[in-house]
Amino acid sequence: KYKPTDATTNPSLILQAKFLEELQNSKKIYNYYKKESVVEHLSESSAKKLEMTEANFRWEMNEDKFAVDAVKLEK
């Protein structure tokens, strides 16, 4: 695609040719993840929704063995 007659006349063409394949691969990755956002995926998935009240939250924190360590680290 790029055919410079001399590398010294236009070295940017050589660099463009080198990175062209890498650019196309990154476009494929971008288009793959652009299809569906994480929020859409989670809202459509069959993930269990949690009903969380303050009392439930405190109970869950007491059940968590590492919650005490987290409080110590915050101080």
Swiss-Prot record:
<keyword id="KW-0704">Schiff base</keyword>
<keyword id="KW-0570">Pentose shunt</keyword>
<dbReference type="GO" id="GO:0006098">
    <property type="term" value="P:pentose-phosphate shunt"/>
</dbReference>
<dbReference type="GO" id="GO:0004801">
    <property type="term" value="F:transaldolase activity"/>
</dbReference>
<comment type="similarity">
    <text>Belongs to the transaldolase family. Type 1 subfamily.</text>
</comment>
<dbReference type="InterPro" id="IPR018225">
    <property type="entry name" value="Transaldolase_AS"/>
</dbReference>
<comment type="function">
    <text>Transaldolase is important for the balance of metabolites in the pentose-phosphate pathway. May play a role in the conversion of sterols into ecdysteroids via NADPH.</text>
</comment>
<comment type="pathway">
    <text>Carbohydrate degradation; pentose phosphate pathway; D-glyceraldehyde 3-phosphate and beta-D-fructose 6-phosphate from D-ribose 5-phosphate and D-xylulose 5-phosphate (non-oxidative stage): step 2/3.</text>
</comment>
<comment type="subunit">
    <text>Homodimer.</text>
</comment>
<keyword id="KW-0808">Transferase</keyword>
<keyword id="KW-0597">Phosphoprotein</keyword>
<dbReference type="GO" id="GO:0005975">
    <property type="term" value="P:carbohydrate metabolic process"/>
</dbReference>
<keyword id="KW-0963">Cytoplasm</keyword>
<protein>
    <recommendedName>
        <fullName>Transaldolase</fullName>
        <ecNumber>2.2.1.2</ecNumber>
    </recommendedName>
</protein>
<dbReference type="GO" id="GO:0005737">
    <property type="term" value="C:cytoplasm"/>
</dbReference>
